[in-house]
Amino acid sequence: MLTMIGKRLMFAIPSLIGVVIVTFLLTRALPGDPAAYFAGPAANKEAIEQIRKKLGLDKPLIEQFFRYTADLSHGDLGNSLTTGQPVATEIRNRLPASAELTLLGLVISVAIALPLGVLAATRPGSWIDHLCRITTTAGVSLPVFFTGLVLVYVFYFRLGWSPAPLGRLDVFYSSPPAVTNFYLIDALIARDLETFRSALSQLILPAVTLAVFSLAPIARMTRASMLAVLSSDFVRTARASGLSPSTVIVTYAFRNAMLPVITTLSMVFSFLLGANVLVEKVFAWPGIGSYAVEALISSDFAPVQGFVLTMAVMYVMLNLLIDILYGVIDPRVRLEG
């Protein structure tokens, strides 16, 4: 297992180097002049040129790249022009908000999609099979920002069941003492049920928005994988041996159907990181997605590069976790690794 993990990490290094190079080049190709934006509309050419020199944008591109990689090797992602704060600090402060939202959305979608896919596979042609198909079609068809706007309109404007979509906490509540920077967990640790209730009420609509977006591929893959496994020889043998239907489904079929589902989960999690950008803007969520969008609009290089690099590292770590789960579920993967 350790050998397999080491190999995966070695293969990930060229990918991260490629991400650094491509991100640097793409940010430099963005329209707009960061120096002009930072100087303001009233600045003259001399002032803009002075700021350009201060930011190092007057240097050749190759020199800018080597300076960037040298800073990166020391953990320095640069400073944001719009906020004046170190990008590493901003990302560290905002990442828990995005992670909490993404993880809860994924948990909700998995809690619905896995049972729905299993039931649809074990009862083909039934009403629950048709429900699974309708749900997956709707989840794929609806844009994530449209789903968010509909939920806000229905549950906030029309019914009044949800609080205003303005961040992680209501204005009347203060943040719980920081332990994990996940408000739900920190509020439970502090035994502050009121803050927990407020944080959950703010989190539920954006999390459901992400869950609707991610539910379709998980349910569809679960159904297809279960149908393939249920028609296999070892399942027929288990049934012929007199085992109960629940034992056959849970012990034999479901476990063997999980490998492609886990692969789908890793892809869905990656998609959710991208969909987070739109959801955070709709719900004014203070995560790294909205931070990157604001930086992109203002041609602020450092936050965009920091955001992409953070997403790349998270993606590499996610793939490593998926490989470890493969080894836990299927011992053949450990032997091949």
Regions from the PLM with identified roles:
Residues 58-114:
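An internal, D/E-rich "acidic patch" concept
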Residues 1-60, 88, 92-93, 110, ...:
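N-terminal signal-anchor/first transmembrane alpha helix
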Residues 19, 23-27, 148, 152, ...:
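Juxtamembrane/transmembrane-helix interface segments of polytopic membrane transporters
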Residues 115-119, 128-180:
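Hydrophobic alpha-helical segments embedded in or immediately adjacent to the lipid bilayer
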Residues 41-56, 147-160, 205-210, 247-264:
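Hydrophobic alpha-helical transmembrane segments
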Residues 3, 7, 40, 50-53, ...:
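Short amphipathic alpha-helical coupling elements at transmembrane boundaries
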Residues 15-66, 155-195:
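Hydrophobic alpha-helical transmembrane segments of membrane transport/permease proteins
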Residues 2-3, 95-128, 144, 175-337:
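Alpha-helical transmembrane segments of integral membrane proteins
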